[in-house]
């Protein structure tokens, strides 16, 4: 009996040692955890287009080649939480939502920053748009005017995004009153909440209700009248525009590629991003620089 027990102990010890050696050589512990946003997310739509993960066939039909087993997160905050808690994770978020719980990678040697976004050196950049119909209520039109005013653009810049009009006129208070409903992108929501807070102090006769969902839902809400203003962190498509809305760009934002703070990788190429997200590269072993 003792002999059998000794043999079993030796086997378990060997298995444990083999697992440890495998991990140290880039085995299962080195496998990349790929984190993506959900379908309908403007951040996902812009990211897959700009990095080549989305491809078109000869007829112009688009295919999203994000790997099927990617972990899907339905908001920026959830992506941050997942990446900060997994040393092998990779994800992508709005540059303006970056915090010190994760590490933003350089892309092609360029760090995401206000300067590199404005210069065009950082390549993964997209607009923040709002979707509105003609004939907005006085209150909704006044809020839009505030967003595009010098006061609104300054709030956008202070929040870490790129203002689209450096010479915007000052906000002119009028007699607008009522309620404005704004819905859509979780990436746009944080800065929209700051804009709404400041606007309601400037015009105390208007209340602004900001509802977070995703870009596609926000655009649909604006089309069907569920909301006055839809938020989108991507370009609004021709098909969407044909349904009675117009697109107004309120800011520019980059998409930051993020990893865990303990990850040794600091820089990544566009080709490597595509390879990771389409599944042709599955470990970090040959990525460390």
Per-region residue spans from a language model:
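Intrinsically disordered/low-complexity terminal segments and short unstructured peptides
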Residues: 2-4, 19, 182
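Alpha-helical transmembrane segments
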Residues: 12-19
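C-terminal motif of bacterial Sec signal peptides marking the signal peptidase cleavage site
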Residues: 20-24
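Exported/periplasmic ABC-transporter solute-binding proteins
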Residues: 25-289
């Amino acid at each position: 009996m003792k002999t059998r027990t000794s043999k079993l102990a030796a086997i378990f010890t060997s298995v444990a040692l083999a697992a440890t050696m495998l991990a140290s050589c880039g085995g299962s512990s080195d496998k990349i955890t790929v984190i993506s946003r959900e379908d309908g997310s403007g951040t996902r739509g812009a990211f897959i287009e700009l990095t080549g993960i989305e491809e078109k066939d000869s007829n112009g039909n688009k295919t999203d080649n994000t790997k099927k087993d990617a972990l899907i997160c339905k908001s920026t905050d959830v992506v941050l939480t997942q990446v900060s808690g997994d040393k092998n994770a990779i994800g992508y978020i709005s540059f303006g939502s970056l915090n010190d719980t994760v590490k933003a990678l350089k892309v092609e040697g360029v760090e995401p920053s206000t300067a590199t976004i404005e210069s065009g050196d950082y390549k993964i950049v997209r607009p923040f748009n709002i979707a509105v119909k003609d004939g907005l209520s006085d209150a909704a039109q006044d809020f839009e005017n505030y967003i595009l005013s010098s006061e609104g653009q300054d709030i956008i810049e202070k929040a870490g995004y790129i203002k689209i009009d450096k010479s915007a006129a000052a906000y002119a208070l009028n007699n607008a009153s009522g309620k404005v409903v704004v819905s859509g992108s979780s990436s746009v929501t944080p800065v929209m909440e700051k804009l709404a807070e400041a606007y309601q102090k400037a015009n105390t006769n208007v209340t602004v209700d900001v509802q977070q969902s995703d870009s596609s839902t926000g655009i649909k809400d604006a089309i069907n009248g569920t909301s006055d203003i839809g938020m989108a962190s991507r370009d609004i498509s021709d098909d969407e525009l044909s349904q009675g809305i117009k697109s107004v760009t309120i800011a520019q934002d980059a998409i930051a590629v993020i990893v865990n703070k303990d990850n040794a990788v600091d820089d990544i190429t566009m080709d490597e991003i595509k390879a990771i997200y389409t599944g042709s590269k599955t470990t970090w072993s040959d990525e460390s620089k």
